[in-house]
């Protein structure tokens, strides 16, 4: 396992641990999810470049599209919760009535 893969795996693991430890605040959870998506993007890109898979070269772009959609939905939910309740606790998500 090369040093780059190990660094990206450690970044993914640290982001996952951060998501598990700081799950009470929504902003912390969103930042940890973005860190996980970034490390997945870099690992996928490096793997595709090292194996010369030209057919799979679109996969990192698709992952970035899903990451952008996740970030937009997460931030809109964060704004809605923080303006309604004045705080960004995840426990307030159960109180939302649409």
UniProtKB/Swiss-Prot annotation:
<keyword id="KW-0830">Ubiquinone</keyword>
<keyword id="KW-0813">Transport</keyword>
<comment type="similarity">
    <text>Belongs to the complex I subunit 4L family.</text>
</comment>
<keyword id="KW-1278">Translocase</keyword>
<keyword id="KW-0520">NAD</keyword>
<comment type="function">
    <text>Core subunit of the mitochondrial membrane respiratory chain NADH dehydrogenase (Complex I) which catalyzes electron transfer from NADH through the respiratory chain, using ubiquinone as an electron acceptor. Part of the enzyme membrane arm which is embedded in the lipid bilayer and involved in proton translocation.</text>
</comment>
<keyword id="KW-0999">Mitochondrion inner membrane</keyword>
<feature type="transmembrane region" description="Helical">
    <location>
        <begin position="29"/>
        <end position="49"/>
    </location>
</feature>
<keyword id="KW-0679">Respiratory chain</keyword>
<protein>
    <recommendedName>
        <fullName>NADH-ubiquinone oxidoreductase chain 4L</fullName>
        <ecNumber>7.1.1.2</ecNumber>
    </recommendedName>
</protein>
<dbReference type="GO" id="GO:0045271">
    <property type="term" value="C:respiratory chain complex I"/>
</dbReference>
<dbReference type="GO" id="GO:0005743">
    <property type="term" value="C:mitochondrial inner membrane"/>
</dbReference>
<keyword id="KW-0472">Membrane</keyword>
<feature type="transmembrane region" description="Helical">
    <location>
        <begin position="1"/>
        <end position="21"/>
    </location>
</feature>
<keyword id="KW-0812">Transmembrane</keyword>
<comment type="subunit">
    <text>Core subunit of respiratory chain NADH dehydrogenase (Complex I) which is composed of 45 different subunits.</text>
</comment>
<dbReference type="InterPro" id="IPR039428">
    <property type="entry name" value="NUOK/Mnh_C1-like"/>
</dbReference>
<keyword id="KW-0249">Electron transport</keyword>
<keyword id="KW-1133">Transmembrane helix</keyword>
<dbReference type="Pfam" id="PF00420">
    <property type="entry name" value="Oxidored_q2"/>
</dbReference>
<dbReference type="InterPro" id="IPR001133">
    <property type="entry name" value="NADH_UbQ_OxRdtase_chain4L/K"/>
</dbReference>
<dbReference type="GO" id="GO:0008137">
    <property type="term" value="F:NADH dehydrogenase (ubiquinone) activity"/>
</dbReference>
<feature type="transmembrane region" description="Helical">
    <location>
        <begin position="61"/>
        <end position="81"/>
    </location>
</feature>
<dbReference type="GO" id="GO:0042773">
    <property type="term" value="P:ATP synthesis coupled electron transport"/>
</dbReference>
<keyword id="KW-0496">Mitochondrion</keyword>
